[in-house]
UniProtKB/Swiss-Prot annotation:
Its main location: membrane. It is a multi-pass membrane protein. GO terms for cellular component: plasma membrane. Keywords: Cell inner membrane, Cell membrane, Membrane, Transmembrane, Transmembrane helix. PANTHER family: INNER MEMBRANE PROTEIN YHJD, UPF0761 MEMBRANE PROTEIN YIHY. The chain crosses the membrane at residues 42-62, 105-125, 148-168, 186-206, 212-232, 252-272. It comes from Acinetobacter baylyi (strain ATCC 33305 / BD413 / ADP1). It is found in: Cell inner membrane. This is UPF0761 membrane protein ACIAD3168. Belongs to the UPF0761 family. The keyword Ion transport does not apply. InterPro entries: UPF0761_bac, Virul_fac_BrkB.
């Protein structure tokens, strides 16, 4: 009841049909449909066990590079200031006490921390893949090398960027005039740290999902998440600093529930950014009709058929382009159905090709292997204007519907009466 009331209320807004508002609704609907809040809760639980190992591995890699060793404390403080809210609870001191004790571990201990970090990244990948409707994760040596690259190069890139920014900050150029405006050194450093936050989100959105994510989508989603994250951090920090009654209730344990709440909110932002990156690749169609699944699959096969004639493959973006807004969520399931019938194959470039001669596949054989009913007369009329192939199959479907309606129009009582 509440859902329909809210929907009717939104439809009364003068900008309801605007593309930008429909895009926002699309993202929010998918956020709820994908149960992102539940996934954020699961990731919060995982993060609780993995945050210290990840920070420790990060600091070990930084310390192993002499050029970055002087910036370790500053870089550590940068991480805390960017990813933890300001409040009366010293989150950084609590985490420092754990990481300092963990930094004296043996090789076996460090290996354990590395495995824990890899498991954390694997959990993140699973959550991202669910949003992208990808059922398979990268396994084996490819998955391991990708995780190793993120773990090893991530700290080095951030550390190098911080060293460069510190060098620039030590110069006098940060307080000079630029285009007639007086530049603030603190503001420049904030921009640098904000840029590093964007870089972190970009690496997540671009590299973690097991599919090709367009760079522009990852960049825009990273900027969106970084802005929301910065806003939430300030609001959260202000609330925690001015409403301290929770400390009277929890006492010395006040940091635990607050830290869990912050992690939960942070993961919601991260997953919302994933939804934005997906929406940027999917929400580009002005077609609003949701067609019968069998008709949708025929439209997809037509795309593959035309591409095969040209000796080309089909990308996700090309397939999504022929779908309506209510159909794009079914694309992964359509791919799975076509693969089961050995009609298409996935290439090493995450694209798809038609691998069978469609002249040897009849419609009835294709249809009976699908988990969908036969399209009826009403379904034949609900198509897109460019579905020209419907001119051939449409009359046959209408004739089949009329035939079945005539043959099966039997009173139910007749079925149950004795002879």
């Amino acid at each position: 009841m509440g859902h329909y009331f809210m929907l009717n209320l939104l439809k009364k807004l003068p900008f309801y049909e605007k593309t930008w508002f429909q895009f926002i609704l699309f993202v929010l609907r998918r956020f709820e449909a994908d149960r992102c809040r539940e996934h954020a809760g699961a990731l919060t639980y995982t993060t609780l066990f993995a945050v210290v190992p990840m920070l420790t591995v990060f600091l070990v890699i930084i310390s192993s590079i002499k050029a970055l060793e002087p910036a370790r404390q500053q870089l550590q403080q940068l991480i805390y200031s960017n990813f933890l809210p300001k409040s009366t609870i010293a989150f950084d001191r609590v985490l420092n006490s754990f990481t300092e004790k963990s930094s004296n571990l043996t090789v076996i201990g460090i290996l354990f921390l590395f495995v824990t970090t890899v498991m954390m990244l694997s959990t993140i990948e699973t959550a991202f893949n669910r949003i992208w409707r990808v059922k398979e994760t990268r396994s084996g040596i490819i998955g391991f090398m990708r995780y190793w690259t993120i773990i090893s190069l991530g700290p080095i890139i951030l550390g190098s960027a911080f060293v460069i920014s510190s060098t620039v900050a030590s110069m006098n150029i940060l307080s000079n005039n630029f285009a007639g405006y007086e530049l603030s050194g603190a503001f420049i450093l904030w921009l640098i740290s904000f840029g590093l936050t964007i870089l972190g989100f970009f690496i997540l959105y671009w590299t973690i999902p097991n599919r090709t994510v367009p760079m522009y989508a990852a960049i825009i989603a990273a900027c969106f998440s970084a802005a929301i994250f910065e806003l939430l951090k300030n609001i959260f920090g202000f609330a925690m600093s001015n409403f301290t009654s929770y400390e009277l209730v929890y006492g010395a344990f006040a940091a635990i529930p607050i830290f869990l709440l912050w992690i939960f909110l942070s993961w919601n932002i991260v997953l919302l950014g994933v939804e934005v990156s997906y929406a940027l690749t999917a929400f580009h169609s002005d077609k609003i009709q949701t067609r019968h699944p069998v008709l949708m699959l025929l439209d997809v096969l037509e795309l593959f058929y035309k591409k095969q004639k040209l000796g080309q493959s089909v990308t996700d973006l090309e397939a999504l382009d022929i779908m309506g807004r209510g159909e794009i969520g079914r694309w992964p399931s359509y791919i799975e159905l076509l693969e089961k019938q050995n009609l298409i194959k996935r290439t090493d470039k995450d694209e798809y090709v038609l691998v069978r001669n469609l002249s040897q596949v009849d419609f009835w054989t294709f249809f009976t292997a699908l988990p969908y009913p036969l399209p009826l007369r009403k379904d034949v009329g609900n198509i897109h204007p460019d579905d020209e192939w419907m001119q051939k199959i449409g009359p046959a479907l209408i004739e089949a519907d009329d035939y079945l309606a005539a043959k099966l129009s039997i009173p139910l009582s007749t079925l149950f009466e004795a002879k």
